[in-house]
Curated annotation (Swiss-Prot):
The EC number(s) this enzyme carries: 1.3.1.98
Domain of life (superkingdom): Bacteria
A single cellular component GO annotation: cytosol
All residue ranges annotated as the FAD-binding PCMH-type domain in the record: 33-221
Essential cofactor(s): FAD
Homology family: Belongs to the MurB family.
Name of the top EC class for this enzyme: oxidoreductase
Pathway involvement of the protein, from the record: Cell wall biogenesis; peptidoglycan biosynthesis
Organism this protein belongs to: Nitrosospira multiformis (strain ATCC 25196 / NCIMB 11849 / C 71)
Protein name: UDP-N-acetylenolpyruvoylglucosamine reductase
Chief location: cytoplasm
Function (record text): Cell wall formation.
Record flagged with keyword NADP: yes
Keywords of this entry: Cell cycle, Cell division, Cell shape, Cell wall biogenesis/degradation, Cytoplasm, FAD, Flavoprotein, NADP, Oxidoreductase, Peptidoglycan synthesis
Length: 347
């Protein structure tokens, strides 16, 4: 795509955010690996993001991410525009609706910050968010959860923005929600295809409509008790997860009535490595960057783990992390690796 077309569109839209070109995505993702993005946009605020989206050519690929804690960008990089919401859509406030206490959080707010804010307000139910290393937008997009609670368990409503810059407030009933799965239901009134889903896109993609914020409904609780729960959760996380090395959290979804980590460990794959990527000896569902890992190293480990577990146990693990972009050398790419191609959130 011709850069003059992009520049003209941005000038015409009158955007106020920051546009960066040819940015190494290892600087924006928690795996600290991968190729470069053709463009990265950091919006000034929600109206600015709307202006940016409206100004783009209709066929410009758009990816939205937060902290990049659930995302791998292949070594060949990614074409199009990557919108980084972390620390940008960062509104966080207490509201009340007919006696129900709500916390509004922008999509770029870190999940842990929401948990701390809720504790400060004497509200419970959001403690688990302290253990999710991503943003509100990413947690909404994948129904992130830990220790028995999932994001949509506490959602009252969400705010979204589409490629035309249109904002909507939607109730949970507009979505199909499951384990690490969120999809917008078909809008029967217009007879249109499921909003945000391109033909042949994965069924859990929200490609043309993204979360820009959410209202969480939380019960009253004692602030000290909430803080103690958060403290205990974080201690458990430190004890069980390899937080000392770059990683993207859980790589695979847990199969029904089982744990991905248990299956991987049962196959003797702890400390299995390719290049700088290794299955963590502390938690088998984590792949860590031991230093200098490429995206190809990480993706090769993912493929090898899936293949080995399938061969030895008969269980086919499903990926939880998102992989976007093109390989540095497509002819050498491990094509059997399953991946999501949508432009949804990356943590």
């Amino acid at each position: 795509m011709d850069m003059s077309e992009i520049n003209f569109s941005l000038d015409y839209a009158g955007v106020r955010g920051e546009l960066r070109h040819d940015q190494p995505m290892k600087n924006y993702t928690s795996w600290r690996a991968g190729g470069s993005a053709e463009r990265i946009y950091l919006p000034g605020d929600l109206p600015d993001l709307a202006a940016f989206l409206r100004g783009l050519p209709w066929n410009e690929p758009v990816y939205v991410m937060g902290l990049g804690s659930n995302l791998l960008v292949r070594d060949g990089g990614v074409r199009g525009s990557v919108v980084v919401l972390h620390a940008r859509l960062n509104g966080l406030q207490l509201e009340s609706d007919m006696g129900q206490m709500l916390i509004y959080a922008g999509a770029g707010v870190a999940c842990a910050k929401v948990a701390r804010f809720a504790a400060l307000q004497g509200l419970g139910g959001a403690e688990f968010l302290a253990g999710i290393p991503g943003t509100v937008g990413g947690a909404l997009a994948m129904n992130a959860g830990c220790y028995g609670t999932e994001t949509w368990d506490i959602v009252s409503s969400v705010q979204t923005i589409d490629r035309l810059g249109i904002l909507r407030r939607r109730p949970p009933g507009n979505y199909e929600i499951g384990y690490r799965h969120v999809a917008l239901k078909a809008e029967k009134s217009s007879g249109s295809q499921k909003m945000g889903a391109r033909e042949n896109a994965p069924d859990d993609s929200l490609t043309d409509e993204w979360f820009s914020g959410a209202w969480f409904a939380l019960p009253r609780d004692h602030a000290a008790a909430v803080r103690q729960k958060i403290k205990e959760l974080l201690a458990r996380r430190i004890h069980t997860q390899p937080l000392n090395l770059p990683n993207a959290g859980s790589v695979f979804r847990n199969p029904e009535n089982d744990k991905a980590a248990r299956l991987i460990e049962s196959c003797g794959l702890k400390e299995f490595r390719i290049g700088g990527a290794m299955v963590s000896p502390r938690h088998a569902n984590f792949i860590v960057n031991t230093g200098g890992a490429t995206a190809s190293d990480i993706e090769a480990v993912i493929a090898a783990v899936r293949e080995t577990v399938k061969k030895q146990t008969g269980v086919e693990l499903k990926q939880e992390v998102r992989i976007i972009g093109t390989p540095a050398r497509p002819e050498l790419h491990v094509s059997r690796t399953a991946y999501r191609k949508d432009g949804g959130y990356g943590g």
